[in-house]
Amino acid sequence: MLSELHGLNDCWNQAWLEKDAATVERLMADDYIYVAPNGLTLDRQAILAIIRSPSYRLDHATRTEVVVRALGQEAAVVRHRVQAGGAFEGTSFTDDHRCVMVCVKQIGEWRIVMEQGSFSSK
């Protein structure tokens, strides 16, 4: 189970680096929600619009400090730090966030239900 969730985390990161919208879509639960460090909430459709946007580019993304905690057999929390940079809608960004992902097993596959990012204090 833990190795599956580490794999999910790696796959999610790689999909964003490769702008692989099909994989991002497959890994998100239908009711996926992202809470950004500024409090903005983005649903599944908003996230898919970003990754599919020609103006979105992720140049690098490194996930460290990954901790997976099982919550029974069908739920887990994944905590990590992500340091990334790229551009969206003509604006460059550099991120350093601590993130929490809530994952559930649905029809035999792990899906990401929600993520929350917070600005890292380093």
Where are these predicted regions, by residue range?
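A beta-strand edge to alpha-helix "cap/lid" segment located at domain peripheries
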Residues: M1-L27, D31-K122
